[in-house]
Amino acid sequence: MAHPAQLGLQNATSPIMEELIAFHDHALMIIFLISSLVLYVISLMLTTKLTHTSTMNAQEIEMIWTILPAIILIMIALPSLRILYMTDEFNKPYLTLKAIGHQWYWSYEYSDYEDLAFDSYITPTYFLEPGEFRLLEVDNRTTLPMEADIRMLISSQDVLHSWAVPSLGVKADAIPGRLNQVMLASMRPGLFYGQCSEICGSNHSFMPIVLEFIYFQDFEVWASYLYIVSL
């Protein structure tokens, strides 16, 4: 999760986020080189006393400043398109989880398990335990198995919301009357935090998301326990 004075992105816990971080560094390096070149040219223009008042055309320069930007745009576009197609790949997901946005909480439904659904509200500050995070904890964490492809179906019951978990590289709009889907996976166990990322009303800042990734066998035990409790 994010921490004070953080300069970079959150640590990646999914292959998609690792690709996004690599693309971010790639694009940032290109921008740095372009900025350095522009500053260098500006400094030359400010310090040189030579002028070219008689130059009417310079086809070589025009060709360079047309072709070079096109090459740079291609260098940025190709890895971006690759990641875009990766996010749309759905190969036999282990389970399907449906997230429904409300003002101002989330509802979750495990489509592969009978009667396994719950609401997830923010934990009030006065109920927080030592070590828990203000405005990020919920009363019911969303538990998922690690190292498994999970299909998320995201919608809304009232207004526009957005389901986002930065460390997984996942962000999808929750739109009333429409289902959006994304694929997510975690390569390690742990707690991962997110929030609603679409302004949805006065309590928009109080819609946290907490995903708890655990081992396969522990997840099956957890799902069986909730099913027994719901009977």
From Swiss-Prot:
Catalytic activity, reaction form: 4 Fe(II)-[cytochrome c] + O2 + 8 H(+)(in) = 4 Fe(III)-[cytochrome c] + 2 H2O + 4 H(+)(out)
Gene Ontology biological-process annotations: ATP synthesis coupled electron transport
UniProt cross-references to InterPro entries, sorted A to Z: CcO_II, CcO_II-like_C, CcO_II_C, Copper_CuA, Cupredoxin, Cyt_c_oxidase_su2, Cyt_c_oxidase_su2_TM_dom, Cyt_c_oxidase_su2_TM_sf
Positions in the Mitochondrial intermembrane compartment: 1-14, 88-231
Subcellular location per the Swiss-Prot or TrEMBL entry: Mitochondrion inner membrane
Membrane topology annotation: Multi-pass membrane protein
Cofactor(s) named in the record: Cu cation
EC number: 7.1.1.9
Chief place of localization: mitochondrion
Residues annotated to bind Cu cation A1: 161, 196, 200, 207
CDD domains: CcO_II_C
SUPFAM superfamilies named among the record's database cross-references: Cupredoxins, Cytochrome c oxidase subunit II-like, transmembrane region
GO cellular component: mitochondrial inner membrane; respiratory chain complex IV
Keyword line: Copper, Electron transport, Magnesium, Membrane, Metal-binding, Mitochondrion, Mitochondrion inner membrane, Respiratory chain, Translocase, Transmembrane, Transmembrane helix, Transport
Class in the EC hierarchy, top level: translocase
Intervals, Mitochondrial matrix compartment: 46-59
Free-text comment on the cofactor: Binds a dinuclear copper A center per subunit.
Gene Ontology MF term list: copper ion binding; cytochrome-c oxidase activity
Record: residues binding Cu cation A2: 196, 198, 200, 204
Top-rank lineage group of the source organism: Eukaryota
Residue stretches spanning the membrane: 15-45, 60-87
UniProt-annotated binding residues for Mg(2+): 198
Function comment: Component of the cytochrome c oxidase, the last enzyme in the mitochondrial electron transport chain which drives oxidative phosphorylation. The respiratory chain contains 3 multisubunit complexes succinate dehydrogenase (complex II, CII), ubiquinol-cytochrome c oxidoreductase (cytochrome b-c1 complex, complex III, CIII) and cytochrome c oxidase (complex IV, CIV), that cooperate to transfer electrons derived from NADH and succinate to molecular oxygen, creating an electrochemical gradient over the inner membrane that drives transmembrane transport and the ATP synthase.
Family under the similarity heading: Belongs to the cytochrome c oxidase subunit 2 family.
Quaternary data: Component of the cytochrome c oxidase (complex IV, CIV), a multisubunit enzyme composed of 14 subunits. The complex is composed of a catalytic core of 3 subunits MT-CO1, MT-CO2 and MT-CO3, encoded in the mitochondrial DNA, and 11 supernumerary subunits COX4I, COX5A, COX5B, COX6A, COX6B, COX6C, COX7A, COX7B, COX7C, COX8 and NDUFA4, which are encoded in the nuclear genome.
Name under which the protein is recorded: Cytochrome c oxidase subunit 2
Species in which this protein is naturally found: Alouatta palliata
